[in-house]
Each structure stands twice: as structure tokens, then as C-alpha cells.
Amino acid sequence: MFKVVICDDERIIREGLKQIIPWGDYHFNTIYTAKDGVEALSLIQQHQPELVITDIRMPRKNGVDLLNDIAHLDCNVIILSSYDDFEYMKAGIQHHVLDYLLKPVDHAQLEVILGRLVRTLLEQQSQNGRSLAPCHDAFQPLLKVEYDDYYVNQIVDQIKQSYQTKVTVSDLIQHIDVSESYAMRTFKDHVGITIVDYLNRYRILQSLQLLDRHYKHYEIADKVGFSEYKMFSYHFKKYLQMSPSDYCKQAK
């Protein structure tokens, strides 16, 4: 759904952010990387990402110059720096930067920022009447990054790891030392929906990314864990109030 450009002259940092952060959980399905501001500017102009994460001190074109070049674009920016100095703070204030992160990057802190950002992006899409607006309410329960219950968080993690398989509730809770009835009741109390409902909503959410990649619909159904295409189609219509084909037409 959303796109991000990660710009840093240190390969270990940009590739680390690309690989370690669970971008799909925050609805970012396309991640681009650049080693300097020149590469980043080209990617930004070409792909129009919703988020840019950039270092400040880089060769060829630094982060401040990059901010100047993209000031007219509608994208969010997170600044990375090894220096807690006024130069990049001033640049960030001038360009309405979303947040600042000092290296080494605290991944948990970045995920908190992403959680806030995705809520804003989805709300904007809903207000603008864009194609994702109908699914905003359906996917609202999936937006919370962490719950205040250990078992609920474990179940959510298991869903995200195994949704592509023909997984059952028993499979999802087999690694936690509680009964199935307790797990189901606790999950519903904290999340507001059942485990099975969460699983199916998450599968449909992931399917939207594959619809954008021109897979056949029966292939998508299998890739996101539905045993039959008709079950995929049923849940798609249930949550989005339209068929996969109609969604694709509306998204064009």
C-alpha cells in the first residue's frame, strides 16, 4: 500500500532497517534504499513515497539539500543522524520533519513512529475518499502495535508469522501455556474481535498488496492462507464491501 525510501551512506544501516523492521505490519509493501541524496531524490521523484528516512551527513547530496529538493512534495520525513546538533534540528523544523532518530537506531522507537504515521495515512485516505477508505474500519483492529497482555501479543505475532498457512486457533496458541478457551476470551476482551476474525482480516489486508502486483486471484487466495478461493472472495466482500475484481477496478 505505502512506500518508503531509506537513505543512508552506511549500507549496514539502510539494509538493516529494510530487513529488521516488519514493514508489512505498518502497511508498507515497497521499500527502496539509496546510498546518498542523489539516489534518494531520483527514487522519491519516481515513486512518490509516503515516507522518507534519511541521514543528514552524506556524500554528493546531503540530507539538508535533499529536504530542500523535496519540500514541495507530500511526504513524511524521519531524520537519522549520529550528531545531536542544531543543524539538522533546524532543517527538520523548517521542513516539518516527522521525527528524529539518533544512530544507532532504536528499532522499537521507529516502530512506535510508524504506528502513529500509518494511522494518520489511513485516516487521510478515508477523508479523501480514496480506494482504501472502505477498508479503514475493517482493518482498524490490526493497527495497534502492542497490547498490554503478554498472551494476546504472542497470538498476534503467531498470526503474522503463519497466516499464509492453513493455521487453526489451536496452532496459534500451542506455544503459550494457557487453555484455548482462556486464550480466545482474553484475545476478544483486549482486541475486540475473535482470533479467527483477526486472522481473516489480516489475510485480506495482506492480499491487497498482492492484488497490486497482478497475481491471479486464486493464487492470492492460496498465498494468504485460504484453502479455497470462494472463502477468500467471501471474506474480501465481508470486510471491504466489494469483490477483489471491483477493488482492482476502483484502485486504478
UniProtKB/Swiss-Prot annotation:
One of its GO terms (molecular function) is sequence-specific DNA binding. Gene3D superfamilies: 3.40.50.2300, Homeodomain-like. PROSITE patterns: HTH_ARAC_FAMILY_2 (PS01124), RESPONSE_REGULATORY (PS50110). InterPro entries: CheY-like_superfamily, Homeodomain-like_sf, HptR, HTH_AraC, Sig_transdc_resp-reg_receiver. The modification 4-aspartylphosphate is found at residue 55. Residues 3-118 form the Response regulatory domain. Pfam families: HTH_18, Response_reg. Residues 170-191, 217-240 bind DNA. Phosphorylated by HptS. It is found in: Cytoplasm. The keyword DNA-binding applies. It comes from the Bacteria. Residues 153-250 form the HTH araC/xylS-type domain. One of its GO terms (cellular component) is cytoplasm. GO terms for biological process: phosphorelay signal transduction system. Its main location: cytoplasm. Member of the two-component regulatory system HptS/HptR that regulates genes involved in hexose phosphate transport system in response to changes in extracellular phosphate sources. Activates uhpT expression to facilitate glucose-6-phosphate/G6P utilization by directly binding to its promoter. Antagonizes CcpA-dependent transcription of a subset of CcpA-regulated genes involved in antibiotic susceptibility. This is Transcriptional regulatory protein HptR. It comes from Staphylococcus aureus (strain MRSA252).
